[in-house]
Amino acid sequence: MKFVDEVSIFVKAGDGGNGMMSFRREKFIEKGGPNGGDGGDGGSVFLEADENLNTLIDYRYTRKFHAQNGEKGGSTDCTGAKGEDLILPVPVGTTVIDVATQEVIGDLVKPGQRLMVAQGGWHGLGNTRFKSSTNRAPRQTTPGKPGESRDLKLELKVLADVGLLGLPNAGKSTFIRAVSAAKPKVADYPFTTLVPNLGVVSVDRFKSFVVADIPGLIEGASEGAGLGIRFLKHLARTRLLLHLVDMAPLDESDPAEAAQVIIDELGRFSPALAERDRWLVLNKMDQIPEDEREARKADIVARLGWQGPVYVVSAISRDGTERICRDIMHYLEVRAERIAEDPVFAEELAELDQRIEDEARARLQALDDQRALRKSGVRSVDDIDEDDDFFDDEDDDGPEIIYVRD
């Protein structure tokens, strides 16, 4: 199944049913009076987080969704039936954005969580409602109100405790295969991983965490090189980042320089994400003579000015992987306890999470704007005159850019 993490859809809630105008007409009953019923409310549109879904592909081709209208009122004071609500299932971790205002309507982060994105129209009133002491036979009714309609952008960010960073062929997929039951494709060429992969790491019988592997970054990713930085958004909700470095690259490149590339690209994408706790994992150390390993480790730590934890592993032979998994589990438990006991720390983390979300969304929007400029033949914003209506929302002749990552 294709992995789709961004879609645009249109939702329309049901209109309210019109009120009914009718009068009681029975044999031997004169001037029976009004008996027109109210209409039914229109159905609303909800998004519901479904833990069995992991992609937005269902909304790639079907983009317009309408809830049921309310039925009109009936005679004998019968109220029209309410329109049926429309419930659209989405993967857990979906962010819902109003396209018109760029406002984040909500995040669906728990299975079964529901979010109303379009409210059904209010029912119309039947003529019975307007009966009074001075108006015994009202002929007034009201129509149902139209339901809300919205253009929405759905963004999926995978939910994981730990995220893996590194250049292509750094061994991220091999690492996730070594520590979990996930089986991502592994090969000796760049960009083997094209979509995020999730793996559940079981440390003890009742202790586990989720790790996410995203496609590798290369130098210039922030400008769109390689697979770009679009997949970095999937690390926004992680609690810890593991920076994997290939210590024995086939092209004999400098591991320290390769690690610095990732650090620089991460900072360009989101300075707040670069503040997330990060551990350095030196992979493929089994290919380095044992008497040289400590010196290699000390050299890269010194050149990077690294202050955080450093681990030496060999993912393919699983050397050192059990230790790092237990340390990760301990880190996550201590972090959760501190959040529960220290409100100041919890607030600081919440602010950091919000900054990461805001910066990631702004950066990705900037990339989409640049792509739109290039496709329109404009090289840069400086080439647009002040009187140019390129960004005029009322100009229907402008290009429409819809980005979907397969």
Curated annotation (Swiss-Prot):
Q: Where is the OBG-type G domain?
A: 160-333
Tell me which domain of life the UniProt entry assigns to the organism this sequence originates from: Bacteria
Q: Which cofactor does it need?
A: Mg(2+)
Q: Where is the composition biased (Acidic residues)?
A: 383-399
Q: Which terms are listed as keywords in the entry?
A: Cytoplasm, GTP-binding, Hydrolase, Magnesium, Metal-binding, Nucleotide-binding
Catalytic activity, EC: 3.6.5.-
Q: Which GO terms describe its biological process?
A: ribosome biogenesis
All copies of the Obg domain together span: 1-159
Instruction: Just give the chief location class.
Output: cytoplasm
User: Per the record, what is one GO cellular component?
Assistant: cytoplasm
Which residues participate in Mg(2+) binding? Answer: 173, 193
Map out region (Disordered) in residue numbers. 126-149, 376-406
**Residues bound to GTP:** 166-173, 191-195, 213-216, 283-286, 314-316
Q: Where is the composition biased (Polar residues)?
A: 129-143
One function term, GO molecular function aspect: GTPase activity
Similarity comment: family membership: Belongs to the TRAFAC class OBG-HflX-like GTPase superfamily. OBG GTPase family.
So what does this one do?
A: An essential GTPase which binds GTP, GDP and possibly (p)ppGpp with moderate affinity, with high nucleotide exchange rates and a fairly low GTP hydrolysis rate. Plays a role in control of the cell cycle, stress response, ribosome biogenesis and in those bacteria that undergo differentiation, in morphogenesis control.
Q: What is this protein's record name? A: GTPase Obg
Q: What is the lineage of its organism?
A: Bacteria, Pseudomonadati, Pseudomonadota, Gammaproteobacteria, Pseudomonadales
- Its gene is obg
